[in-house]
């Protein structure tokens, strides 16, 4: 587990929602969960792929960018977790470069030398990599590099340093679950639980009453995962409908259902799911 940084809190919340014991003190580096037969080690996010790839740990949560930067052949991504999204881009002074080919032979500063080296090698571009441990946006101003390659969320930090993004994205990154070469015992359960959390975060439950003659039209508006549950009401001309709907856009779905003739439309949270 990430011990700190942007991935740590959300990863811990996700494991808690999946039914696992988490640490109570942010300084704790080890937590045992005997009920689920799992041990959690809290490590630097950058080191997690190394531990998993070497076989010291069975699975881990880290960033896709950190996994690729580690270049550990024994570690691989098995599930994207839907948080910690970012892109990996090149940046330089405005107008200095416009294409990746122009980087050939220049100095590029980055905190992800493994990732950048692999990417540029695939493109047939040779650069003089300048490895730094963070805050790479200052490298151009200080004369250490001609360009930088770094994780970008909004681009504000790069713009404040007088840099502009150029070239294609190196990578779309997010938090991922990684595993080693062998599938450890309990991985299937962990995956099923985490996928249940992802479903619970992405969907809500919608309940509404509707004239029975309008069911087909309502299902076209909100089809659900497989098929809605339709139950009879005391009034034989009306039915109760329950359906899972994507959280994003649910208010538009409610508006459409109401316009169709549905009433008593309720939306409730899903706390856990198995599909």
Annotate each predicted stretch with a short phrase.
Residues 1-38, 62-87, 95-275:
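Small-molecule-sensing regulatory modules
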């Amino acid at each position: 587990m990430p011990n700190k940084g942007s991935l740590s809190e959300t990863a811990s919340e996700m494991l808690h929602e999946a039914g696992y014991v988490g640490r109570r003190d942010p300084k704790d580096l080890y937590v045992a969960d005997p009920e689920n037969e799992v041990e959690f080690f809290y490590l630097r996010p950058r080191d997690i792929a190394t531990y998993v790839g070497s076989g010291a740990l069975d699975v881990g949560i880290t960033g896709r960018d950190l996994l690729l930067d580690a270049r550990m052949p024994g570690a691989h991504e098995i599930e994207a977790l839907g948080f910690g999204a970012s892109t990996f881009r090149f940046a330089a002074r405005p107008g200095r470069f416009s294409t990746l080919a122009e980087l050939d032979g220049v100095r590029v500063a980055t905190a992800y030398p493994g990732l950048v080296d692999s990417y540029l090698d695939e493109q047939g571009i040779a650069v003089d990599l300048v490895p730094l441990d963070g805050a790479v946006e200052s490298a151009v101003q200080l004369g250490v590099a001609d360009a930088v390659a770094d994780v970008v969320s909004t681009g504000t930090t790069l713009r404040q340093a007088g840099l502009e993004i150029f070239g294609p994205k190196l990578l779309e990154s997010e938090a991922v679950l990684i595993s080693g070469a062998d599938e450890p015992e309990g991985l299937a359960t962990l995956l099923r639980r985490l996928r249940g959390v992802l479903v619970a975060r992405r969907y809500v439950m919608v309940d509404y009453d509707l004239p029975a003659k309008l069911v087909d039209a309502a299902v076209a508006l909100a089809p659900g995962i497989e098929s809605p549950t339709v139950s009879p009401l005391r009034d034989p001309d009306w039915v109760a409908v329950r359906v899972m709907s994507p959280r994003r856009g649910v208010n538009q779905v409610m508006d459409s259902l109401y316009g169709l003739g549905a009433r008593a439309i309720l939306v409730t949270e899903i706390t856990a799911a198995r599909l």
